[in-house]
Amino acid sequence: MFHKIAAVAVSLVGLMTAHTVMAGPVLMISIDGMNPEYVTEAQARGLKTPNLRRFMTEGAYATGVRGVAPSVSWPSAASLMTGTPPNRHGVLNNERFEPTDRNRPAGIYYFAADIRTDTLWDAADRANLVTANVDQLGSVGSRSVRYDIPRYEPSAWYPETLKALEATASPPGLLTDLQGKLGRYTGIDFETRDYDAVRTRFAIEILRRYKPQFMTVHLSGVDVEAHEHGPFSPQSLKAAEAIDDLVGQLRAAALANDPDAVVAVVSDHGQAPATRTLSLRTAFVQAGLITLAPTTPGRPVQIVDWKADVWRSTGAAIMLRDPADTATRDKVRALLKALAADPANGVSRILEGAEIEATGGFKGAAFVLDMKSGVTVGGDLIGDLRRDRPKPVGVHGYLPDNPQMNAAFFIAGRGVAAGRNLGQVDMLQIAPTLAQVLGVRLKDAQARPLPILQP
């Protein structure tokens, strides 16, 4: 069995502090879009999640995890793996902002090379631990993940995406070999509706065959259903119950490898219901900040020039083509203030300068527009300024002090105090906590580990 008591030096906030740690195998399960209340208030909400509820009595848990800015998946996933904020690790949104072509979506931060700070995979690999991953974001091309089925969707056509997954899985041939036993990998074919069960089946086989000492698994069902139907809708509650069963299977597989294994369940963000969209870019077009080509019926609207544009994340970062253009900056500021003056637009606050820097995100933004719960920023270039939906959908991306954006954290296993309520914690504490349990040094983490260990 892989476990021992070890004293390691952990670099935190620029200091080298000695910690006695429980060095043992760790399985981290990330449940996308899961508010903590799916577990902490399960009984009150009529939810049957016995496997997740066990963590509250058998281990330590947070009532809420304050996330990062913006509270969307890719920056949050990188912070969970590094203990650093987006402005340090470099993953600033789900999609990049591409100033040279504003007519197409920019690339997604799929690649390990996009993360500029030390990850738990890196730290575990340096310590010669066996690492593995199924679908946790940001692993494509990593040299630190020995057995990896990454999240990578380069094509809207799943057969092409599957070819890309087979080509980028590590080591070469891993996914093809596993499919020979387990059948076709449909872990990111969201038309199948059993994507999480498929990921779990492949993760359990990796656990059984290769006995990784640090493994990450990402599950999406709660996020998918909450986006479509709203958080805590019957559909998202059903997804949470299905994931609870998968968590039980994964935990059992980890404990079958080593009864002293530690299992952590995290989420990247919560979700909030929303019914209104503010089409901020239409206001930018009307103000002359974005110039459009003449419209042609049946063809997409095209931007031909821009001075300021919107980088959306439920709220928005406002990017200037020329950051030194003070006239445009002043014009944008005045426009945003005018929009905020109308309560119907749902603007919560406008940030700039040091206020943006303090969020730890939105690097390069001239302004950040945070919205009130229930209102999101849309991407339309023409049409009405506001649009209302007949039924709520689920959204995230608000600034992390919005309690509906709270993420979740549960942990249980050898050395973890049972029944310990950690209260409200910071997402940047999770990676150094798991590094402490693994007995590895995470180079760039800037927060102290959570007090999860038994005295």
Predicted regions: what they are:
Residues 38-39, 193-210, 214-217, 222-264, ...:
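A long, amphipathic alpha-helix that forms part
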Residues 1-9:
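Bacterial N-terminal signal peptides that target proteins for export
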Residues 40-88, 130-132:
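Short, structured active-site-proximal loop/turn typified by the sulfatase FGly-forming signature C/S-X-P-X-R
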Residues 85-230:
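His/Asp/Glu-rich, glycine-adjacent segments
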Residues 63, 70-72, 97-113, 117, ...:
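Secreted, luminal/periplasmic, and some membrane-associated catalytic domains
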Residues 382-420, 429:
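Low-complexity, glycine/alanine/valine/leucine- and proline-rich hydrophobic stretches
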Residues 11, 21-22:
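Cleavable N-terminal signal peptides
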